[in-house]
């Protein structure tokens, strides 16, 4: 029994020694208050262990930070609300009717490109025609859904 106690005491002493000699930036043995102070402090050290005069030098300069949010502006609150509402509507929609009309020729260009690719890689004419018809029907369905969504 005495040998076991001796081993446990040695283990406890080595743990205490390693905790007291650990690196100053180690976060494994720091209390929560010290950890928050270390996070706030740019050097990562606990300010409570430093003399007051030196701690004042280490604190970040808060005079440059903007604390007052009441900055005067020429834009009124109602104009800001209108702009925010318009922004929400346009961003949720993501497009305009004018931008959609300019993209219709792209669909036909994609169709022609797919026909060319199929002509190069699909050598059976019947299979190629079936794939072209399927892709054409798919494009018609997509266009129908887009037009119904716009209305």
UniProtKB/Swiss-Prot annotation:
Ranges annotated as spanning the membrane: 130-150
Function: Membrane-anchoring subunit of succinate dehydrogenase (SDH).
GO molecular function: metal ion binding; succinate dehydrogenase (quinone) activity
Protein name per the record: Succinate dehydrogenase subunit 4, mitochondrial
Membrane topology, from the record: Single-pass membrane protein
PANTHER family noted in UniProt: SUCCINATE DEHYDROGENASE SUBUNIT 4, MITOCHONDRIAL
Binding site for a ubiquinone: 121
Entry superkingdom: Eukaryota
Species annotation: Arabidopsis thaliana (Mouse-ear cress)
GO biological process: mitochondrial electron transport, succinate to ubiquinone; tricarboxylic acid cycle
């Amino acid at each position: 029994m005495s040998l076991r106690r001796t081993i446990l005491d040695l283990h406890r002493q080595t743990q205490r020694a390693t905790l007291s000699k650990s690196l100053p930036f180690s976060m494994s043995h720091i209390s929560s208050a010290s950890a928050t102070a270390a996070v706030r402090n740019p050097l990562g050290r606990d300010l409570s262990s430093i003399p007051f005069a030196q701690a004042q030098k280490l604190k970040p300069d808060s005079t440059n930070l903007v604390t007052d949010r009441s900055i005067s502006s020429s834009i009124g609150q109602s104009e800001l609300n209108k702009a925010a509402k318009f922004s929400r509507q346009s961003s949720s929609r993501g497009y305009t009717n004018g931008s959609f009309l300019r993209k219709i020729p792209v669909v036909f260009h994609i169709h022609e490109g797919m026909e060319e690719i199929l002509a190069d890689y699909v050598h059976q004419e019947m299979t190629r025609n079936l794939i072209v018809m399927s892709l054409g029907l798919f494009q018609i369905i997509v266009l129908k859904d887009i037009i119904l969504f716009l209305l």
